[in-house]
Amino acid sequence: MPVQGSQRRLLGSLNSTPTATPKLGLAANQTGAWCLEVSIPDGLFLSLGLVSLVENVLVVAAIAKNRNLHSPMYCFICCLALSDLLVSGSNMLETAVILLLEAGALAARAAVVQQLDNVIDVITCSSMLSSLCFLGAIAVDRYISIFYALRYHSIVTLPRAQRVVAAIWVASVLFSTLFIAYYDHAAVLLCLVVFFLAMLVLMAVLYVHMLARACQHAQGIAQLHKRQRPAHQGFGLKGAATLTILLGIFFLCWGPFFLHLTLIVLCPQHPTCSCIFKNFNLFLALIICNAIIDPLIYAFRSQELRRTLKEVLLCSW
């Protein structure tokens, strides 16, 4: 839990590492006058977290309510929403505790605050890892549904999906605990960066392959109906735009955070890197924005889920 400036101590002391002058030997003016620090107000942090929290709670509630949505695909979507919910909730909790401590409204011993911070860090880190894993799992599920359509229901069964979900959660908690314990080791940070890049490559390869198959299918239909080529080109451009948006949002929201981790290893004392470190809160805000966008991309496009969501909202009133 931070007490130095406005930087949050997410993931152990990770974000305080760049600002800890004694450890890095950086003078306050070493970053230079050109350094741009984007300040994220606590109110904005809480607002983004609240929007994400409400969105993802609604997704989980809708999937839990409708038995027609109890399928492997929606199982992964539900777990993605739960991961995003935990990301937002843990950041909101940390921000609230920080504000209470700074205002003197919450009195606690340093040891208690440290333990609370460690718990929040583990929850945040494990939910981030699981969120990335479930994004990959959704991509794999969609890939199988397209390229192995006839065998899909025998390959992707609900018990298998549940085992995958359990494995992801266990692995996420285990590795996040190790990460918090050994956050100051370069190898640990590099492993996280490699994991992010692996998920990015996996999603890019699968979705590009799916787009290529969809374009071939559209071209075949166009030839059967003797349509002109521009119609097929229009479909390809639309699909490429959708793919660019999907992968672009993923990279834009997650990339800066993992760039932060990479620079901690490569250039912890360089003035330029130190300038980037000052925007850690911005990188966290982008991840929370991703938690807001995920339901719009993966959940709310489903007509069945939207119908169930209306029922949930009507019942709540």
From Swiss-Prot:
Glycosylation sites: 29
Assembly behavior: Interacts with MGRN1, but does not undergo MGRN1-mediated ubiquitination; this interaction competes with GNAS-binding and thus inhibits agonist-induced cAMP production. Interacts with OPN3; the interaction results in a decrease in MC1R-mediated cAMP signaling and ultimately a decrease in melanin production in melanocytes.
Lineage: Eukaryota, Metazoa, Chordata, Craniata, Vertebrata
Pfam families in UniProt: 7tm_1
Cellular compartments annotated: Cell membrane
GO molecular function: melanocyte-stimulating hormone receptor activity
Residues on Extracellular side: 1-37, 94-118, 184-191, 267-279
Alphabetic keyword roster: Cell membrane, G-protein coupled receptor, Glycoprotein, Lipoprotein, Membrane, Palmitate, Receptor, Transducer, Transmembrane, Transmembrane helix
The name this protein goes by in its record: Melanocyte-stimulating hormone receptor
Transmembrane segments: 38-63, 73-93, 119-140, 164-183, 192-211, 241-266, 280-300
InterPro entries for the chain: GPCR_Rhodpsn (IPR000276), GPCR_Rhodpsn_7TM (IPR017452), Melcrt_ACTH_rcpt (IPR001671), MSH_rcpt (IPR000761)
GO BP term, example: adenylate cyclase-activating G protein-coupled receptor signaling pathway
Lipid-modified sites (S-palmitoyl cysteine): 315
Main location: membrane
CC terms in the record's Gene Ontology section: plasma membrane
Topological relation to the membrane, as annotated: Multi-pass membrane protein
Physiological role: Receptor for MSH (alpha, beta and gamma) and ACTH. The activity of this receptor is mediated by G proteins which activate adenylate cyclase. Mediates melanogenesis, the production of eumelanin (black/brown) and phaeomelanin (red/yellow), via regulation of cAMP signaling in melanocytes.
Positions of disulphide bridges: none
Stated family: Belongs to the G-protein coupled receptor 1 family.
Parts of the chain on the Cytoplasmic side: 64-72, 141-163, 212-240, 301-317
